[in-house]
Amino acid sequence: MKLNRKSILLPSPLGEGSGVRLLWLLLALFALTAQAQVKSKVITTLKGYPSGTIDEYHFHAGNAVVMGRFTNRTEHKFSTFNVTGTDLFSNQDFVRTIHIESDGSFLELISLPHSGWVYFDGVEIPPAFIAVGDTLEIQVDGSVNEAKLSGSGVTGEVNSVWPRLESQFSSKETRTPWEGLDRKFMLEWKNRKVKELDQIASAIDSDTITLLNGCSHHAKDVLKTSLLAMPLEQMLVAMHQWWWRTRSEDGKANPALTISAASFFDFLSVRQSYLMDNPLMVFAADGGGVINNMEFIVLNAYLFLANDMQRWSKTTDSDELGNYKQNFILPHNYDPALHREILVFDKGHLVSVADYYAMCSDSIRSRFGLSNTGFMMQLCLLHRVLDFDFEGSDDWFLTRKAEELAGAIPQFTAPSICHHAVDVYRRFVIEREGNARMDASNSTPGDSLFQSLKEKYAGNVIYMDFWGIGCGPCRRGMLDQRTLVEQYKDAPVRFLYICNEKDSPREPSEKFLTDNDIQGEHIFLSSDEWNLLTSKFQFNAIPFTLLIDRNGNIVEKNVPPTAAKLDELLK
């Protein structure tokens, strides 16, 4: 290190002897070391955070009231709007439809998977925090296109303070870090974000955030967590974007632009108590973004089975034994003879599902320097286990999910994780086993609308694509499917492209469809009809797709159609 006396403000030495010079050199090194230590100090735990006032109840499902009024409505007087969100434990979207009276008022008791942030479809209302047991009140003035949020308990406190708090601590960065794919700028930007994070942590630790004065401890916990989540979510999104943008069309990375997740997120380990092992992240305003991107970018060993660990859903038919050479996980329905045959392919190395998940956890902790399998790791593993996006009722699927849940349980120590793991699986089994016994008399308006859409094309394989003109992935998917639509134009296969006419007006939508020769059936729904279907299928993002067999049964959700699958359904 080059020393600069002026930078450390030391006077000139009194003598020129070697002993004196050595003494001053040691003093200079001591001063610089002290400066570096002060500069690099990181707060590992935050005083008074969390406060311990948020009990387990708020991590569980419950009800809340949404009420309010629309005044001075000048646009189309829609009769419903949707409250949407994500169950951050099961990773499933939820949609609750709110009915508007003729005078513009609304009052609805809705169920929530846990306290957290919700969004609003079809109306200009900002995101809102809502706690189970509370009331969220919304007043919307159509003449100025303004919504005011209030409510009871912590719901009212958080929604009152958060807009001002977010503005106070929002980033001053104006350039997106992946702009121009400048690796040096990306890393410098990351360092500035870590500094922002540390400034927020310091303000929380020293209790100097004046906007929190007068708030309950519960509200303070939610608001402080939302502040911590802001820069963390921005860094996760930036790395996600960087990962995709620095790869070629065939998915290969550019070595000159590669940034490893382990080096980019090297700041997590010393801050893990409030970033990685913090259950309150599910209550943060950006909590969903943090958890979703954490799952894909940092903790993807669970999701993608990284580190050369591979696990596939295979049967144990003798003609498929060769496929196990890529798989060292014991199949759930093996017998001793089969076991011996598999060992030949895997050179004697087979482990249980529980051991496999333990290996994944060990790998993540080692890679990112984490001292324990904290809440965030447990949550992302739970998402892996609770991936139930399969519409069949095959016994093998139920058995495999039970095996995966049993294998993951040793990794779960957080009470809220354990609760949701068992509760979601219980509901999954009830729904699967109860499908055949569902009484048609219990059908909803959404069921009736869906049935009417299917009946028009009865006897056909139906691919339903819920899209919007402003959705890039939707448009790209439709363009990619043109060859497939043409290939099956004379077969009993129908492609239905369904949109909300309010969000996708006919003129620009039909122009896109015509200009790009998008064939198929094009259906424009009213906002109320769209809300019925989003509520029925519980989706709040598009594209959302359904593949339906010739008997009217849903066989796949959110899976792009393929010729192989269509041919299978046509047999």
Segments and roles (model prediction):
Residues L23-A31:
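Bacterial N-terminal signal peptides
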Residues V144-G459:
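Oxidative protein folding and maturation machinery
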Residues G15-G17:
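Glycine-biased, low-complexity coil/linker segments
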Residues V38-H218:
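A non-transmembrane, solvent-exposed segment enriched in polar/low-complexity residues
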Residues N460-I462, F466-G470, K502, A541:
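Short pre-active-site segment immediately N-terminal to redox-active cysteine/selenocysteine motifs
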Residues V353-A354, E510-R550:
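Short, internal strand/loop/helix patches
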Residues F466-T483, N500:
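Conserved redox-active cysteine motifs that mediate thiol-disulfide chemistry
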Residues N540-F544, R550-K571:
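Non-catalytic, surface beta->alpha helical segment in thiol-disulfide oxidoreductase systems
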